[in-house]
Structures are given as C-alpha cells and as structure tokens.
A protein has these predicted regions:
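Pore-lining transmembrane helices
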Residues: 1-66, 70-277
Length: 278
C-alpha cells in the first residue's frame, strides 16, 4: 500500500488540474518517480505536469474533426499523455529532481541538531496551516517518503504536528468554556479522540468558524511539538496511527511530553486570542 502513495498523490494532483483524463497520466508519472530517485519531489512535479499536459492536449484536440474529438478522452489523451509523461519523467524530471531529492535526503541524514529542530518546527507548523489541505498533505507525504529514506525522526515530527490541533482545541473547550459556543463545547471531547488517533481534520469546524484566532494558535503549538520531537530525537517508523503506534515510537515518553507541551501551548493561545462568546 505504501508503494501506491506517490502515484496516487501525483494522480489526484493531475486530476485537480486536468480532470479525470489526467488521473492515469499523473499516476504513471508518480509510479516512475516512486521507482526512481526523484521520489516525493518527482511525484509533485509529475502531478502538475500531467494536469497541464492534458489541458494542452485538450486544446489541440478541440481543433480536430468532431468524430475524432469524441474519442479523444478515451484514446488520444491517455496514449499521448502517458507517452509525453514517460519522456518528460525519464529525460527531465528524474535527472533534475532525483539529484535534488538525493541531496535533500543526504542533508537530512547529516544535519546538525539545530537544523533538525528547525525542520521539525516547519513541518509541525505545516500540519496545522490548513488541517488536511495541500500544506498538511505535503508535509505528511514528505514524512512518509522520509521513512523510506531511513529518516524516521521526520515522520515523528509530522505526526505530532497533526495530533496537536484537535487535542489543543479539546483542552481549550474545557479550560476556556466562555470562549466557545454550546455546540463547540459539546464537540470538544470528541477532538481528544480524533487528535490522539492523528485525525487533524477534527479541528476544521473550529478553525472555519474563527480562522484568524484558531489557526495561529494551532500553528504555534504544532510547530513547538514538532521542534520538541526533533530535539528529543524521537523516531517513528509507522506512517499513521497516532497513540496506537506509540509502542513503536523511539523515545516514546519524551514524545508524549512534546505532544502535551504543544497541546498546552495551543490551548493557552486559544484562550488568549479567542473572543468571549455572548
């Protein structure tokens, strides 16, 4: 299943740009990236490239006779799209992005303590920026790709960054009840469960109702948790699971400390930033 992550990522990026005909083209590009050296970065490029390849083919096919235009989505788009994608990946994307990806993984393996903490800070914060959106997914896929490269501390920072927002919101609904509506207070405890299970999306309704105050608080707490996870040299070899994979976390006790610290920081900031509900 892990081997399909990059192809699926590339396929759905492509589909978001070029609609359904781009899915197969993006998937093929992601497969080439997954089997080559470009990895996550190559899959990202493949997804965008596939989407725009299909858009280009659509404009070209619009000038063809109507009889040919009707078969374009099922014949011309996939055949020419996959052909172009294969050439692009093998002769352009793989050499360039492969070199960048190799250098990046080497740098991550050899980085000093300060640099590791900074990476954890950034990735943890990204997990809370849009809570399930592009930034969140980019950080998550980078974390899972790092597992394959043997950098298990990165995945630990990513997961803890995603666990923090729901846990923090749940804690804030208990500590600062006057800052939340009755419905939000009732939904608060559920976020504890979702946060511990690494389901960041549980925080979305709270962020959507007050993004200017909720998002900054969650980002700061998640960034702090990610940085602490790196500072404590915590590691994680599983791509998901939340508290259920704590038995395979390296330095699990300190990992829990980092989670509690990030949760408390975000909860306190929520209490300070949010306005009192009438």
């Amino acid at each position: 299943a892990f081997g399909f992550m990059l192809p699926v990522l590339a396929g759905f990026i492509a589909m978001a740009i070029g609609d359904r005909p781009a899915l197969a083209v993006g998937f093929v590009g992601g497969m080439i990236a997954s089997g080559g050296k470009s990895g996550f970065l190559g899959a990202l490029v493949a997804g965008f490239a596939a989407g725009y390849i299909i858009l280009g083919l659509r404009k070209i096919c619009a000038k063809l006779p109507q009889a040919i235009e009707k078969i374009a989505p099922v014949l011309l788009y996939p055949v020419f799209g996959i052909l172009i994608m294969g050439l692009l990946m093998n002769f352009v994307v793989e050499p360039i992005m492969g070199a960048i990806n190799t250098a990046l993984n080497t740098g991550l393996s050899n980085m000093g303590e300060t640099s590791k903490v900074l990476v954890g800070l950034i990735l943890g914060g990204m997990m809370a920026i849009d809570m399930g959106g592009p930034f969140n997914k980019a950080a998550y896929v980078f974390g899972t790709a790092s597992i394959a490269a043997g950098n298990y501390d990165i995945m630990a920072a990513v997961m803890i960054g995603g666990m923090t927002p729901p846990c923090a919101i749940a804690l804030a609904t208990l500590l600062f009840k006057h800052k939340f509506t009755k419905e939000q207070r009732e939904a608060g405890p559920t976020n504890f469960i979702m946060g511990l299970a690494f389901i960041t999306e549980g925080a979305i309704p709270f962020a959507a109702s007050d993004p200017l105050h909720v998002l900054p608080a969650c980002i700061v707490g998640s960034a702090a948790a990610g940085a602490l996870s790196m500072a404590f040299n915590c590691t994680l070899m599983a791509p998901h699971g939340g508290i259920f994979v704590f038995p395979v976390v390296g330095n699990a006790l300190l990992y829990l400390v980092a989670l509690v610290a990030g949760t408390v920081i975000s909860a306190v900031l929520l209490g300070l930033l949010k306005k009192k509900v009438d």
